[in-house]
Amino acid sequence: MSLITSSGAFAQKIVVAHRGASGYLPEHTLEAKAMAYAMGADYIEQDVVMTKDDQLIVIHDITLDRTTDVGEQFPGRARADGKHYVIDFTLAEIRQLAASEGARIVNGQRVQGYAARFPMRTSSFRISTLAEELELIQGMNKSTGRDIGIYPEIKSPEFHLAEGKDLGRAVVAELKAYGYASKEQKVFLQTFSWEEVKRLRDEILPEAGIDLKLVMLVGDDEEYQWMFNESGMQEVGRYADGFGPDKSLLIAPDSTPGNLKISNLVELAHSNGMQVHPYTFRADAGQVAKWAGSFEEMLEAFFFEAGIDGAFTDFPDRAVEFLRQR
């Protein structure tokens, strides 16, 4: 499907597989990406972090602890805060780690983040490089005749720069090497850093000789509040083609079935030429909005009452089917 980004008129609504089909398989594994592809997602997300030897890997956190067995494989390698940072390990070392469904620490024990998902520490999964994932998606595009897009995120660019690594420039170089060069292609490049969005638009992309659609990710944090009005959104729209808010910024969590408290952020973004792709839609117990009777009712409200253009979801099959039925 074509995407129109130069005006307020946008193409068909899209489904973005958040960390792949992460509701069914461990996040950011190639298996989760292949499943998302087969489920019909329009775009597949890649969170990108850099290793000690400047390799680009696909992982959500800048640390390895939540989704791997790094503490067991490499004792004594944590920083003072007790965490194992990707940037302190080479790709060869990271290849030795087992990837797994995410965990949190409760009373010193690892507890699976979402209890009903793929069992933690079972089967065999690995962390992949950005290149490997791009080759997987492009390979399936060739073998199926489809054109499924990519949605990479530059993770914590300021952290990387402070460590002497220009992650944004490296990601753009990798995308260019794999043929992503224009806004007409199915690629969105996202980040939570306003400074990085400006640097990408003003410096990195022009120097690389390519032009990609950029998405400004935002949370409900003080640093983003200036964007949530006409003048702020106009400034964001000078640099970004898309606006990626936490979904709670669009429909207030304390809404009720008969009274949805819908903000004006979608309207503001659209009037400034940006698509709106909020995150994250989950069907797990406790993750469906209290004002919605089901996952699908939640999607209905966001897509057709709030007016979003696309959604990040851990359950791409259900979102795809919802839009097909709609």
Model-based region annotation:
Residues M1-T5:
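Bacterial N-terminal signal peptides
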Residues S7-R326:
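Phosphate-group recognition and catalysis centered on beta-loop-alpha active-site segments
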